[in-house]
């Protein structure tokens, strides 16, 4: 199973917590980490904390995203997942992107192995009426527009590479 994180150095602690929650249910995972500012100490910390898993650290060049708007709430790293199909090795056919502030409470295998049915993504939504109303109000959406949690995205990398135009 391939799992993708997009982080900066401030999120190492949350990343470790998320990985620990994943390991309660699933093993044999390759973690791909898109980053800009992780140093060797950060990488060693993750690898030593989880010696039974494989880490792939992919440094993203800042100039690739220099014109993207950011704020303290929305750092540059939130955009990396949008370009995952270009940033990740061509040998990968799918990957599960997770925000690192997620605590996993069951195995991810069923989600990971879902059939894309020609879709680019499989995403999670909030289906409860309370959450629909809350998200509509918080994000300025109409009540009948579904809210998609972009913090949990199964990506069809083969289809994304074929269909997405980098210029878009």
Summary of predicted features, one role per range:
Residues 1-168:
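Glycosyltransferase catalytic domains, chiefly GT-A lineage
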């Amino acid at each position: 199973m391939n799992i993708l994180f997009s982080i900066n150095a401030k999120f190492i602690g949350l990343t470790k917590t998320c990985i620990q929650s994943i390991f309660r249910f699933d093993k044999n995972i390759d973690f791909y980490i898109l980053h800009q500012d992780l140093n060797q100490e950060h990488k060693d910390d993750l690898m030593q904390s989880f010696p039974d898993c494989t880490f792939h650290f992919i440094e993203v060049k800042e100039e690739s995203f220099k014109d993207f708007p950011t704020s303290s709430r929305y750092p540059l790293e939130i955009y990396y997942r949008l370009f995952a199909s270009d940033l990740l090795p061509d040998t990968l056919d799918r990957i599960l992107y997770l925000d690192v502030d997620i605590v996993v409470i069951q195995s991810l295998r069923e989600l990971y192995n879902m059939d894309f049915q020609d879709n680019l993504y499989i995403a999670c939504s909030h289906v409860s009426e309370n959450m629909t109303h809350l998200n509509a109000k918080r994000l300025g959406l109409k009540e009948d527009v579904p809210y998609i949690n972009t913090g949990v995205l199964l990506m069809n990398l083969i289809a994304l590479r074929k269909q997405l135009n980098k210029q878009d």
